[in-house]
From Swiss-Prot:
This is UDP-N-acetylglucosamine--N-acetylmuramyl-(pentapeptide) pyrophosphoryl-undecaprenol N-acetylglucosamine transferase. It comes from the Bacteria. Keywords: Cell cycle, Cell division, Cell inner membrane, Cell membrane, Cell shape, Cell wall biogenesis/degradation, Glycosyltransferase, Membrane, Peptidoglycan synthesis, Transferase. One of its GO terms (cellular component) is plasma membrane. It is an enzyme of class 2 (transferase). UDP-N-acetyl-alpha-D-glucosamine binds at residues 26-28, 137, 177, 205, 306. Its EC number is 2.4.1.227. It catalyses: di-trans,octa-cis-undecaprenyl diphospho-N-acetyl-alpha-D-muramoyl-L-alanyl-D-glutamyl-meso-2,6-diaminopimeloyl-D-alanyl-D-alanine + UDP-N-acetyl-alpha-D-glucosamine = di-trans,octa-cis-undecaprenyl diphospho-[N-acetyl-alpha-D-glucosaminyl-(1->4)]-N-acetyl-alpha-D-muramoyl-L-alanyl-D-glutamyl-meso-2,6-diaminopimeloyl-D-alanyl-D-alanine + UDP + H(+). GO terms for biological process: carbohydrate metabolic process; cell division; cell wall organization; lipid glycosylation; peptidoglycan biosynthetic process; regulation of cell shape. Belongs to the glycosyltransferase 28 family. MurG subfamily. It is a peripheral membrane protein. It is found in: Cell inner membrane.
């Protein structure tokens, strides 16, 4: 027995566990793995990261882990040859993962969705190892749809998340990076009439080209008084930076542009308003810090999961869902002008966003992982989690 469960539902670990994390791909799959890894390391567990051969060299907590790389291939959105190649890579990766897990014999294997996790999770299921998958989005991705009914426990970020057939979800919330969670204690600094208005525009881990054209056009439509107040921080793709900078300079708008901000959590903390995509990690971080946002879902996401994510925050009053198809410079300028003129609306939205956050999501997920390794299920109080 590795763990025991006291009456309050918190898990007490008696012996270190060996836990394998299967993660890779975009930040939406990697950031919750990083958050969980930090909590598990704090508890004294041994971790191994299993990712795909094309994966990034990770920094932060994941960069400190013993890392194994296997083949993995996706099939969604690819042509016939691409799908065939993906299926071959999936089969070969599953064989590699099977041999790796037989050798490592972890106490539990945890997956975070995306094609990079599938070979390892299929191998773990075949070996009858305890397994957990965490679904970040309100609409599950194809990888977790495949796995949800087969794994030991299926954890979700949203209480109203779509439930795959045969799955029994456990709501834990969206684990956010420790660097973000550390700033949760710093409250929302409401903008003051006539003074600086800090606007953060970020397109997520893959950037958002539409923001490079639409946002500068919208800001140019604001009144001179509004433009003079703006302090813009914008993430752009490298090839877009010079054009965006020229537009802002022509309008006299103070702007800092970069393809990457290493201090993005601090910039998120300092923002009066955020314009962003609505990936699960982004929505989770907005809620953790309590920052109001205009949410523009990526319209080409499979199953349109970003719209479902954004709707959760919009419905509790923590942000404003603006679909890209209906978003024009005029519509965005009108919304921005209204918000800049009414800071009380932003304050209320910040409070609503914060109320939707689940700051202990990494702890909840770590409890579930530890309990699954010991064939127990922790008692988690129900909570309507919207972000």
């Amino acid at each position: 027995m590795n763990a025991s469960m006291p009456r309050d539902g918190a898990l007490l670990v008696n012996a270190p566990l060996h836990i394998a994390l299967a993660a890779g791909g975009t930040g939406g799959h990697v950031f919750p793995a990083e958050a969980l890894a930090g909590e598990l390391i704090r508890r004294g567990h041994k971790l191994t990261l299993i990712t795909d051969k094309r994966g990034h060299v990770y920094g932060g907590t994941l960069g400190l882990l013993d890392t194994k790389r296997i083949l993995a291939g996706g099939v969604a959105g690819r042509g016939v040859i691409g799908r065939l190649r993906g299926m071959i890579e999936l089969a070969m990766g599953s064989l590699q993962a099977y041999g790796l897990l037989r050798r490592l014999r972890p106490d539990v294997v945890v997956g975070f969705g995306g094609y990079a996790s599938v070979p390892t999770m299929l191998a773990a299921i075949r070996l009858k190892l305890p397994t957990v998958v965490h679904e970040q989005n309100a609409v599950p991705g194809r990888a977790n749809r495949l796995l949800a009914a087969r794994v030991s426990r299926y954890a979700v970020s949203f209480a109203r998340a779509e439930r795959p057939r045969g799955a029994r979800p456990v709501v834990v919330g969206m684990p956010v990076r420790p660097s973000v969670l550390a700033l949760r204690g710093e409250g929302y600094d409401a903008p003051r009439p006539g003074l600086d208005f800090r606007l953060l525009i970020t397109g997520g881990s893959q950037g958002a080209r539409v923001f490079a054209t639409l946002v500068p056009q919208a800001l140019a439509l604001l009144s001179p008084a509004h433009r003079a107040r703006l302090r813009v921080t914008q993430q752009c793709r490298p090839e877009d930076i010079e054009a965006v900078r020229a537009t802002y300079e022509a309008q006299g708008i103070d702007a800092l542009l970069s393809a990457f901000f290493s201090d993005l959590p601090e910039r998120l903390r300092d923002a009066h308003l955020v314009i962003c995509r609505s990936g699960a990690s982004t929505v989770g971080e907005l809620a953790a810090l309590g920052r109001p946002a205009i949410l523009v879902p990526f319209p080409h996401a499979i199953d349109d999961h970003q719209t479902a994510n954004a709707r959760g925050l919009d419905e509790v009053g923590g942000g404003w869902l603006m679909p890209q198809a209906a978003l024009t410079p005029q519509a965005l300028a009108e919304r921005l002008g209204e918000l800049m003129d009414d800071p009380d609306v932003l304050v209320r939205a910040a409070q609503c966003a914060r109320g939707a956050g689940v700051p202990d999501a990494a702890v909840r997920l770590a409890d579930l992982v530890s309990a699954t390794a010991d064939h127990r299920v922790p008692e988690m109080p129900p909570k309507e989690i919207s972000a």
